[in-house]
A protein has these predicted regions:
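Alpha-helical interaction segments
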Residues: 4, 30-31, 54-57
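Amphipathic alpha-helical segments typified by the pilin-like N-terminal helix
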Residues: 11-36, 41
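Low-complexity, S/T/G/P-rich flexible repeat/linker segments used as non-globular hinges
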Residues: 143-167
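Extracellular/periplasmic head regions of type IV pilus-like filament subunits
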Residues: 35-139, 153, 166-167
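Sec-dependent bacterial lipoprotein signal peptides
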Residues: 1-12
Length: 167
């Protein structure tokens, strides 16, 4: 019976070995970021576009760009210099492990999506949107998600939205 179930799972395309899909990192990390931002807001009555201020840093080997504001310097994950953490508005992908350059992701990120990132309104009546962008295969197109502290037409607060689907 067990071999029949495993056979059916394999025929259906079920992935029992590889683990979660590659886009899971992005969605899970965006939810973690909103958790950090909500905790920071409860203490400071504001959100921050500086990941270090809210206690966020992606794990080693991250595939994605995490963008907290449409403009500003980003923390690099390679040998090139980065801004001081307190000035950074995001993190680039881990170039050492993934071979993806921050500039490659930034140049392919559509301007209208990049403009979604950042603060909206005056705190404490403000909202924050954070982007996650990366290329999961070897074509020029990106996958882009966002998460926000506000309710949006496509999803309630704290729920990632997939804006560009590359796969």
């Amino acid at each position: 019976m067990r071999s029949l179930l495993v056979g059916l799972a394999l025929l259906s395309g079920c992935n029992l070995v590889k683990g979660p899909p590659r886009d899971h990192e992005c969605r899970a990390t965006l939810r973690t970021i909103i958790g950090h931002e909500d905790a920071f807001f409860s203490r400071a009555q504001r959100y921050s576009v500086h990941p270090a201020e809210v206690g966020f840093a992606p794990s080693t080997g991250n595939r994605y760009l995490y963008l907290f504001a449409p403009k500003g310097d980003l923390t690099r994950r390679d040998e090139l210099p980065s801004p001081p953490l307190e000035e950074s508005v995001g993190y680039g992908p881990d170039t050492r492990k993934r071979g993806v350059l921050l500039e490659d992701v930034l140049t392919r990120l559509p301007a209208d999506l990049r403009a979604l990132a950042g603060l909206e309104g005056e705190c404490p009546r403000c909202e924050l949107t954070v982007l996650c962008a990366g290329n999961l295969d070897d074509d020029p197109d990106l996958d882009v998600w966002s998460i926000s502290t506000k309710d949006r037409a496509e999803a309630p607060r704290g729920t990632p939205i997939h804006h560009l689907r590359d796969l």
